[in-house]
Curated annotation (Swiss-Prot):
Family listed: Belongs to the CCM1 family.
Transit peptide start and end: 1-90
Misc: Involved in mitochondrial-nuclear incompatibility, a major determinant in reproductive isolation between species, through hybrid incompatibility of Ccm1 and its interacting partner 15S rRNA between yeast species.
Gene: CCM1
Primary site of residence: mitochondrion
Source organism per UniProt: Candida albicans (strain SC5314 / ATCC MYA-2876)
Keywords on record: Mitochondrion, mRNA processing, mRNA splicing, Repeat, Transit peptide
Top-level taxonomy: Eukaryota, Fungi, Dikarya, Ascomycota, Saccharomycotina
Protein name, UniProt field: Mitochondrial 15S rRNA processing factor CCM1
Length: 768
């Protein structure tokens, strides 16, 4: 209780210990005597709370301290009002029902009765400081330490400076967001309290250096404005802080790069650029994807006799790998790091990046050599490196048996597989056609709510790679390893597909009996994804795997249905031309036409009965008329379509795809490709078209495709072997000879491989 006391006509706030004891009229109990408090011991232990000082009216007060007290109270009240005003500006009144800012009033009718005498003792013990902690009681945690803010800035901020805590807080779930809001609030209050005027440059620089770079990125305009108001010049360390904050993240926009160049110009006016400045500058150009400007920076460093550091080499290597996609130049820079000096030796991070680049470009043997070189140097191996090598080995026929060995090394190191490792497990099992294992791994991801679009794509890929047991000639890769056998057996027994997770339509069986099972389940999963995650279905790679399931396991009707329902022709950029085709039937054809119509109707009824499709897809397609659940067709989808036309020998569908592929070449999506990529896609489609006509025994049409593009495409025996074998089988020796001549001419022209006898003949004709 606080009592107001007057001494010499001066008001003062003095704490008095008073206790309210209820009377008998309230308690209906006998009054009990309050034992007098024990005198305080002068030998107070460390950590005890010092009780409030007792004051007697007869005591002579310290008039000097009492006279200064009202001024301190006024200052505290002024700071408190300013603090309240700033807080009120940042509150959002619309969040009235927020569970974090509002609380329900407790129901007092459900509270137990209170023993007033016992409560009185507790209150007395609390205010007198004599209550002891129980044996099991846990003392409250100490408040987090505040930031070391200069005193003159702390005085200007007042109570608001106590809001700031260090960025590394363990008890806060959202430390970054909380600190960012506090810094913005703090700078606003500092600006309103006079800004930087009257403060020393050293204190200002020390204060701004406390701001984390991630938060500083959004506060740069406010800080520059505060410097301008105070008519102070920004020192070069602050400019460098701005640059470091702007270089955070994976990419840097052109506008941010302009700011970085501006700040570096200001730094160069105040001091000479050091190695740290050049390292940050090169890193910024790498993230801005302007590697061509790095040569000029290196030339400046050479003029100033500044050696190229290891960090600069690392940034250049990462730029060639992840931004420029120039694998060869990345390898050249990596070799320079190894043989230049001892200071520039690459560490495990650089080795990991180069190994990832080798895996991306299908150079698995080089990746393995670098891996063993890394181990010989005694460097640490991380989990992402092992999982990347496992994924790369699964793509190679020579090293695919080592894929699961690298994954099991993750368990040998005692690591818990992260999301990337788990996704690579899915990929290896899917690429191997192990549908049972892929389904189980995906089921585990459903249970932990960690499903990604990449994992879903690998599940669909496993269906497209499925081979029935009676046709499979090789064991699954995981069964070639003893650990793999135990791993597969245990995880299959641990999953019960009869208990669906999140309604995902897995069929209630862990065993895959035949291809109809795969067709039915993939169709049901596609329908479920249309209803719940339609954004997944707009990727061409996913649609290609979904369509390939019908190509490998179904018939033409199944393929045509999936091709039309999951993809569409993007007409952006295609010129609109009206085509009118007039067909006049002959007078002697009515009987044949009627017969043909009856046959088509009968075949369509048979196809509809044999179609394995989810009933939900039929209902969805009746209500959906646009392409929001489809992916735009690309060159790979057209390659699959023309391949299906040849496999199922459907001439009409082949003509339809051939015409639509011509329209696709006029679209914006094809025009945006590089000329090299366009030529490569056209050559692949031409190769599949030759195979299509060959499967239909239209050998002359297939040879016409080759002959019309002999000067454009590097035809080889890989594309022409099917046509040559078909010509030999049908006894068309002239056509086979013509195909062999085309292969010889194109191989010599495009510096390809030729046979030894053909090379001898070529050298004899050349004469040298």
């Amino acid at each position: 209780m606080i009592r107001l006391i007057r001494w010499n006509n001066v008001q003062s706030l003095v704490f008095k210990r008073c206790l309210f004891v209820p009377s008998n009229s309230l308690t209906n109990k006998r009054k009990r005597r309050i034992p007098p408090s024990k005198p305080r011991s002068s030998n107070r232990k460390d950590g005890d709370i010092e009780p409030y000082r007792m004051t007697d009216q007869n005591q002579t007060p310290n008039t000097g301290s009492i006279a200064r007290l009202p001024a301190e109270v006024k200052k505290e009240l002024k700071d408190l009002r300013s603090f309240t005003k700033v807080i009120a500006q940042h509150l959002k009144p619309e969040q009235e029902n927020d569970s974090l800012t509002s609380a329900e009033k407790p129901d007092t009718s459900q509270l137990p009765p209170i023993d007033i005498e016992e409560a009185t003792d507790d209150i007395f013990g609390e205010i007198s400081g004599t209550k002891k902690l129980s044996a099991n009681a846990v003392p409250p945690p100490p408040p987090p330490p505040g930031l070391d803010i200069p005193d003159e800035i702390k005085e200007r901020l007042g109570l608001l400076s106590e809001l700031l805590v260090p960025a590394k807080t363990s008890n806060n779930k959202l430390p970054e967001k909380q600190v960012e809001n506090n810094w913005k609030l703090l700078l606003s209050q500092l600006d309103q309290a006079g800004g930087l005027s009257g403060l020393s440059k050293r204190s200002v620089s020390k204060f701004f250096s406390k701001i984390p770079p991630k938060n500083l990125k959004n506060l740069i305009p406010m800080i520059e404005n505060m410097y301008n108001k105070a008519e102070m010049s920004i020192p070069h360390p602050i400019y460098y802080m701005f640059v470091r904050s702007l270089t955070l993240g994976d990419k840097i926009s052109d506008s941010q790069m302009q700011l970085i160049n501006k700040y570096f110009q200001e730094i160069s006016k105040q001091t000479d650029l050091k190695i740290d400045h050049y390292e940050t500058m090169i890193l910024a150009y790498v993230k801005n994807n302007h590697m061509e400007k790095i040569d000029g920076i290196l030339a400046q460093m050479k003029k100033k006799n500044i050696e190229i550091s290891k960090m600069i080499y690392t940034s250049i290597v990462r730029g060639y790998i992840f931004y420029q996609k120039d694998h060869q130049r990345a390898l050249d820079t990596f070799d320079s790091m190894k043989f230049l000096s001892q200071k520039t030796q690459p560490d495990e991070k650089v080795y990991t990046d180069v190994i990832v680049s080798c895996v991306m470009h299908r150079e698995i043997e080089r990746a393995l050599d670098l891996y063993y070189e890394l181990k010989d140097k005694g460097m640490n191996v991380n989990q992402n490196l092992l999982s990347t090598l496992a994924k790369g080995c699964s793509r190679s026929k020579q090293f695919k048996t080592q894929a699961w060995n690298f994954l099991f090394q993750v368990y040998d190191h005692g690591w818990v597989p992260n999301l990337q490792t788990y996704e690579h497990m899915l990929y290896i099992a899917a690429r191997d056609g192990d549908v049972e294992l892929t389904r189980v791994l995906f089921y585990k991801m459903l249970q932990t709510n960690s499903v990604t679009i990449r994992a879903f794509r690998y599940l669909i890929l496993s269906y497209s790679k499925y081979v029935p047991p009676h046709k499979r000639k090789e064991k699954h890769l995981i069964l070639l390893n003893h650990k793999g056998q135990l791993f597969r057996q245990n995880i299959l027994q641990d999953v019960d597909f009869s208990k669906p997770v999140h309604g995902f339509p897995f069929l209630p069986s862990s065993h895959i009996p035949d291809s109809k099972f795969v067709l039915a389940e993939s169709s049901a999963i596609w329908a479920h994804t249309v209803m719940n995650n339609p954004s997944f279905l707009r990727q061409q790679t996913l649609v290609a795997s979904y369509v390939s399931i019908a190509l490998e396991l179904g018939d033409f009707t199944e393929f045509k249905d999936r091709f039309d329902s999951a993809s569409y022709l993007n007409t952006d950029g295609i010129p609109k031309v009206r085509e009118i085709e007039i067909i006049e039937p002959r007078q002697d054809e009515p009987t044949e036409k009627a017969t043909t119509t009856e046959e088509q109707n009968a075949s369509s009824e048979t196809d509809n009965n044999s179609l394995i499709r989810s009933p939900i897809l039929n209902q969805l397609q009746q209500n959906i008329n646009d392409n929001q659940f489809k992916a735009p067709r690309d060159s790979y989808l057209y390659n699959l379509a023309i391949k299906a036309a040849g496999k199922f020998k459907n001439y009409g569908f082949a003509q339809e795809i051939l015409h639509e592929r011509g329209q696709f070449r006029k679209s914006n999506s094809f025009k945006l490709l590089s000329p090299k990529q366009q030529n490569q896609d056209d050559f692949q489609f031409a190769g599949y078209l030759v195979e299509c006509w060959t499967n239909m025994n239209l050998l002359e049409d297939a040879y016409a495709v080759v002959l019309s593009s002999v000067d454009r495409f590097p035809w080889s025996w890989r594309e022409l072997g099917v046509l040559n074998n078909a010509a030999m089988k049908l006894g068309s020796l002239e056509l086979a000879e013509a195909v062999r001549k085309v292969a010889q001419v194109t191989q010599v022209k495009h510096h390809g491989k030729i046979k030894r006898q053909d090379f001898k003949t070529y050298v004899m004709k050349r004469g040298y």
